[in-house]
A protein has these predicted regions:
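Acidic catalytic/metal-coordinating carboxylates
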Residues: 67-73
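Receiver (REC) domain active-site loop signature in two-component systems and cognate sites
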Residues: 63
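Hydrophobic/aromatic residues positioned on beta-strands within the core alpha/beta folds
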Residues: 87-89
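Alpha4 helix (beta4-alpha4-beta5 surface) of REC/receiver domains from two-component response regulators
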Residues: 70, 92-109, 116-119
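Two-component/phosphorelay signaling modules centered on CheY-like receiver
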Residues: 16-36
Protein backbone atom coordinates (compact mmCIF):
# COMPACT_ATOMS: atom_id res chain seq x y z
CA UNK A 1 0.00 0.00 0.00
CA UNK A 2 1.30 3.45 -0.89
CA UNK A 3 1.95 5.99 1.81
CA UNK A 4 0.79 8.74 -0.52
CA UNK A 5 -2.61 10.33 -0.12
CA UNK A 6 -4.27 10.19 -3.52
CA UNK A 7 -6.28 13.35 -2.98
CA UNK A 8 -3.11 15.38 -2.31
CA UNK A 9 -1.89 17.34 -5.33
CA UNK A 10 1.50 19.06 -5.38
CA UNK A 11 1.92 21.95 -7.85
CA UNK A 12 5.51 23.03 -8.58
CA UNK A 13 5.81 26.19 -10.67
CA UNK A 14 7.30 29.67 -10.38
CA UNK A 15 4.27 31.33 -12.02
CA UNK A 16 2.07 32.46 -9.11
CA UNK A 17 -0.93 33.22 -11.33
CA UNK A 18 -0.80 29.76 -12.89
CA UNK A 19 -0.47 28.15 -9.46
CA UNK A 20 -3.43 30.12 -8.12
CA UNK A 21 -5.74 29.14 -10.98
CA UNK A 22 -4.78 25.45 -10.86
CA UNK A 23 -5.06 25.37 -7.08
CA UNK A 24 -8.52 26.95 -7.10
CA UNK A 25 -9.83 24.51 -9.71
CA UNK A 26 -8.49 21.48 -7.87
CA UNK A 27 -9.66 22.64 -4.45
CA UNK A 28 -13.18 23.11 -5.80
CA UNK A 29 -13.07 19.39 -6.66
CA UNK A 30 -12.02 18.57 -3.07
CA UNK A 31 -8.35 17.91 -3.75
CA UNK A 32 -5.90 19.03 -1.07
CA UNK A 33 -3.37 21.22 -2.88
CA UNK A 34 0.13 22.19 -1.83
CA UNK A 35 2.00 24.84 -3.79
CA UNK A 36 5.76 24.95 -4.17
CA UNK A 37 6.59 28.23 -5.86
CA UNK A 38 9.68 27.26 -7.79
CA UNK A 39 12.19 24.73 -6.58
CA UNK A 40 15.22 26.21 -4.87
CA UNK A 41 16.93 22.85 -4.30
CA UNK A 42 16.25 19.13 -4.29
CA UNK A 43 16.19 18.92 -0.49
CA UNK A 44 13.28 21.37 -0.41
CA UNK A 45 11.33 19.35 -2.97
CA UNK A 46 11.95 15.97 -1.32
CA UNK A 47 11.06 17.50 2.07
CA UNK A 48 7.70 18.69 0.75
CA UNK A 49 7.03 15.29 -0.84
CA UNK A 50 7.95 13.51 2.41
CA UNK A 51 5.69 15.77 4.49
CA UNK A 52 2.70 16.22 2.14
CA UNK A 53 2.72 12.75 0.51
CA UNK A 54 1.12 13.79 -2.78
CA UNK A 55 -0.78 11.36 -4.96
CA UNK A 56 0.27 13.36 -8.04
CA UNK A 57 2.78 16.11 -8.84
CA UNK A 58 2.43 18.75 -11.56
CA UNK A 59 5.92 19.98 -12.49
CA UNK A 60 6.75 23.08 -14.50
CA UNK A 61 9.65 22.92 -16.96
CA UNK A 62 11.12 26.42 -16.70
CA UNK A 63 11.96 27.46 -13.13
CA UNK A 64 14.83 29.34 -11.57
CA UNK A 65 16.98 27.24 -9.28
CA UNK A 66 16.28 23.59 -10.05
CA UNK A 67 14.84 22.93 -13.50
CA UNK A 68 11.70 20.89 -13.89
CA UNK A 69 13.67 18.30 -15.82
CA UNK A 70 16.22 17.82 -13.03
CA UNK A 71 13.50 17.80 -10.37
CA UNK A 72 11.45 15.19 -12.25
CA UNK A 73 14.49 12.98 -12.79
CA UNK A 74 15.30 13.19 -9.07
CA UNK A 75 11.72 12.33 -8.09
CA UNK A 76 11.70 9.34 -10.43
CA UNK A 77 15.02 8.03 -9.09
CA UNK A 78 14.18 8.49 -5.40
CA UNK A 79 12.57 5.46 -3.66
CA UNK A 80 10.33 7.84 -1.69
CA UNK A 81 8.77 9.37 -4.79
CA UNK A 82 9.41 7.16 -7.82
CA UNK A 83 5.87 5.76 -7.84
CA UNK A 84 4.19 9.18 -7.68
CA UNK A 85 2.87 10.25 -11.10
CA UNK A 86 4.56 13.41 -12.36
CA UNK A 87 2.67 15.47 -14.92
CA UNK A 88 5.03 17.82 -16.72
CA UNK A 89 3.78 21.16 -17.93
CA UNK A 90 5.26 23.83 -20.11
CA UNK A 91 4.23 26.52 -22.53
CA UNK A 92 6.80 25.25 -25.03
CA UNK A 93 5.60 23.55 -28.20
CA UNK A 94 7.76 20.49 -27.52
CA UNK A 95 6.29 19.76 -24.08
CA UNK A 96 5.70 16.08 -24.98
CA UNK A 97 9.39 15.60 -25.80
CA UNK A 98 10.46 17.49 -22.68
CA UNK A 99 8.20 15.34 -20.51
CA UNK A 100 9.56 12.15 -22.05
CA UNK A 101 13.17 13.27 -21.59
CA UNK A 102 12.49 14.10 -17.94
CA UNK A 103 10.83 10.75 -17.25
CA UNK A 104 7.41 12.24 -16.50
CA UNK A 105 4.27 10.12 -16.63
CA UNK A 106 2.30 12.56 -18.77
CA UNK A 107 2.27 16.19 -19.87
CA UNK A 108 -0.01 19.18 -19.98
CA UNK A 109 0.56 22.23 -22.14
CA UNK A 110 0.28 25.51 -20.22
CA UNK A 111 -2.70 27.67 -21.12
CA UNK A 112 -4.59 24.40 -21.24
CA UNK A 113 -8.28 23.74 -21.16
CA UNK A 114 -9.08 23.44 -17.43
CA UNK A 115 -11.07 20.18 -17.69
CA UNK A 116 -7.84 18.57 -18.94
CA UNK A 117 -6.21 19.39 -15.59
CA UNK A 118 -9.06 17.66 -13.77
CA UNK A 119 -9.05 14.72 -16.19
CA UNK A 120 -5.34 14.02 -15.67
CA UNK A 121 -5.63 14.45 -11.91
CA UNK A 122 -8.54 12.03 -11.70
CA UNK A 123 -6.85 9.51 -14.01
CA UNK A 124 -3.62 9.34 -12.03
CA UNK A 125 -5.13 9.47 -8.55
CA UNK A 126 -7.84 6.84 -9.12
Amino acid sequence: MSLNTLENVLLVDDDIDHLSICSLILQRRNYAVRILSGCKNMDELIGVVREFRPGIIFMDHDMPGVSGMDATRELKSNPLSKSIPVIYFSGQDNVAELASAAGADDFLRKHFYMPKLLELTARYTA
